[in-house]
Amino acid sequence: MPSQSQPRARATAAAALLLSATLAACGGDGDSKDEDLSAQKLNWKDCPAPADSEGGGEAPSPLPGGAEWQCATMKAPLDWTEPKGDTIGIALIKAAASGDKGHRIGSLVFNFGGPGGSGVTTLPAFGSDYAKLRTRYDLVSFDPRGVGRSAGIECEDDEQLDEYFQQDSTPDDDAEKKKLVENVKAFNSACDKNSGKTLPHVRTTDAARDMDLMRQVLGDDKLHYFGISYGTELGGVYAHLFPKKVGRAVFDAVVDPTQSAEEGSLGQAKGFQLALDNFAKDCTSKVEDCPLGDTEKDVKERIATFLDDLDSKPIPGLPPRDLTQTAATNGILQALYSKDFWPYLTQGLEEAYEGDGRILMSLSDSMNGRDEDGEYSNIQAANIAINCADDKARYSTRYIEEKLPAFRKASPLFGDYLAWGMAGCTDWAVEGQADHPDVGAAGAPPIVVIGNTGDPATPYEGARAMARALGKGVGVEVTYKGEGHGAYDSKNACVRDAVDGYLLDGEVPKTGTVCS
């Protein structure tokens, strides 16, 4: 099922489907006591292959020229209110700058979103996209606390997760509602049992403080930063806490920092419905006949009927699992993150209508961090833990039922699914921090804020809200008229020029710039 504020979202979620190369970095716990953590020296080594629990596979391929990706572990306080207490290990990855050392600016730190996404996994998979930026920066990313090898949150085991992600997430009667809440409580109880020591310390404010420690340990006077999706929220919180330490920063696929978890979920309902509308329009406007229907209305009605039928009669998926209504919905949402994956969605739906749910199940597995061997990463456990630690609101069954009409109006297809996702923090062991993050950053330098008009997961309005919330003279708004979650990865020349010009040469784009 979706987690509360489902999911705030993953910038690389859709692309992750066809990526088999992941990696892990060493992490660990320790005892700081009187150690000055800002003076620690990182022990960079060639990155190892990931553990089975992180998806398996091989170590990342060498960089152009033969250099290897380097991994290290940074010690950080477990509890930032007790900086001399116990420590945790924060896993880092780096690609050293490829250009002349005399032109090196420093480190460029990436967060690719989630919350719960592994930067140590994602950066090497997409490193070639940032080759130009690497000419003047060391490219650096990390597993935020609670993610992957950085004291990764552990909840249920793989077998239990198979059941959890197959459950009915859109209950139709009291018995189904009760079962849904019971399953959520059991999952959350397992998180507390297995990771209770860490749960109070995975808030976004904690991760932001880790980034400032990272800045110091990397030897940079300022934090140069590229945040995508949830990474924009993390970057905004950093700018609020450390405005004078912000260097050149870019936010892409921007979370609306003014919204509550409920408002964010409702915004996603509208965003994914828009993406579905655009998908149906794209399919039916092609020269060839759309295999899903003759008109946009036909396409959407057939999908709705298909999902309704799955509620009572699942079809074969990836043996031994069937494709349930929840898995199919999750798979469709996954494919709507990127226009590049619309052909897979078309094929997946076409085959599912004939009784073969394997493609949609694969898409759902990708969203949930499940590999072909049935091993789950901790991306969803971390997503829930971070969201529930951040978001103060807790939503009862009765409250969600009252809000269903608004969600259904926003998205006839996805409204129920996203509304019931708000139950994800029921009986969570840690109190949420706030209704929404503080990102006001008076005194910070310009931050480039890019919004896609067709972004389903972080709707365009979020970029405008972030630019305003950062403060006058800080948020520099750039609009990309296009589909998908994230603008830089679209390879749009206008967007690339705006971002590269700022990060490499300090040229601030004109606020209000529109790229299409």
Feature locations, PLM:
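Alpha/beta-hydrolase fold nucleophile elbow
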Residues: 220-230
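Catalytic histidine neighborhood in serine/cysteine hydrolases
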Residues: 92, 471-486
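Conserved alpha/beta-hydrolase "acid-adjacent" motif
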Residues: 456-462
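Catalytic-loop region of hydrolases
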Residues: 2-14, 24-169, 208, 297, ...
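A catalytic-pocket lid/entrance helix-loop region that shapes and gates access to the active site
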Residues: 154-168, 239-302, 347-362, 366-371
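Alpha/beta-hydrolase fold active-site neighborhood
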Residues: 300-444
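Short beta-strand/loop motif that positions the catalytic acidic residue
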Residues: 443, 448-451, 455
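Catalytic histidine-centered segment of alpha/beta-hydrolase-like enzymes
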Residues: 483-495
